[in-house]
Amino acid sequence: MRKFVFLMIIETIHIILKILIIVIPLLVAVAYLTLAERKVLGYMQARKGPNVVGVYGLLQPLADGIKLFTKELVIPHYANLFIYVAAPVLSFTLALIAWGVIPYDKGVVISDLKIGILFTLAVSSISVYAILMSGWASQSKYAFLGAIRAAAQMISYEVSIGLIIITVILCVGSLNITEIVLAQSSGIWFFFPLFPVAMMFFASALAETNRAPFDLTEGESELVSGYNVEYASMSFALFFLAEYAHIILMSCLTTILFLGGWLSPIVFFKGGPAWFGLKTSFIILLFIWVRASFPRMRYDQLMALLWKSYLPLSLAFVVLVASLLFGLNGLPPS
């Protein structure tokens, strides 16, 4: 009995350490992504960005974190207290859970599920509930309208993302994320044969994460700040962390599905987490560049882009890829 309890304790400690090894670097990455975004936007707009706190502003995320987490938690008088507080916690928790199946290298993953890509899509889809909860519980018309917009936008573009993922799955024959990466080890990443699909996935990822030019949920001239307008201090910080964790997650998925994950683009260089980080950083830089370069779309244009363009195109690519694979050499083994 004692041996069993001892083994259970050891196993629990092992699981906690694996989770912390993933979560702590992720939180640091999210913190410094905010600084990187402000710096890049600053240089694109002919200014320097944050450069006062620490050397070259490197301590700015720490200062922002201390400021937000030490402020008073202000709860609106008519808000539903439990749902109001639970929404940012749920959003942040789901943003972390999705990382449980993301491999940084072969074997470097918390849980290498056989249905890993489906798990990631499912967890990402559930996050829309946290946004709806925040908009409804705030008892604010601006927050509620922002939440409805966000829900409609995220649910719509998840359809496109799902069909695009099916296209890649057809080429691989597996829902396992590690196998999706290894299927590209022959030297041809899926970005090249599936270039239009990759472009649609990136645009859908922008819409899924509510980023410019699809940031209709926080149109300052209309909704002040969107679904989180009534949030401040720690609760606002949790929404903020969840949003940027989701951006990094979608960048990682783009890298995994179309850019070969941790595989090296140069034959005589060994692949690894460094290559995975470089490719993901490049996709994140594209997110920031798009924000600095393109104006916000109208809401009707946003919805028309999906339902009239991306949905038929992504469905057509599913049929085309399946037909080509079946006609030429048969579908990959399941």
UniProtKB/Swiss-Prot annotation:
Its main location: mitochondrion. Its EC number is 7.1.1.2. Keywords: Electron transport, Membrane, Mitochondrion, Mitochondrion inner membrane, NAD, Respiratory chain, Translocase, Transmembrane, Transmembrane helix, Transport, Ubiquinone. It catalyses: a ubiquinone + NADH + 5 H(+)(in) = a ubiquinol + NAD(+) + 4 H(+)(out). GO terms for biological process: aerobic respiration. It is a multi-pass membrane protein. It is found in: Mitochondrion inner membrane. The chain crosses the membrane at residues 4-24, 82-102, 115-135, 161-181, 187-207, 222-242, 247-267, 268-288, 311-331. GO terms for cellular component: mitochondrial inner membrane. GO terms for molecular function: NADH dehydrogenase (ubiquinone) activity. It holds the Pfam family NADHdh. Core subunit of the mitochondrial membrane respiratory chain NADH dehydrogenase (Complex I) that is believed to belong to the minimal assembly required for catalysis. Complex I functions in the transfer of electrons from NADH to the respiratory chain. The immediate electron acceptor for the enzyme is believed to be ubiquinone. Belongs to the complex I subunit 1 family. This is NADH-ubiquinone oxidoreductase chain 1. It comes from Metridium senile (Brown sea anemone).
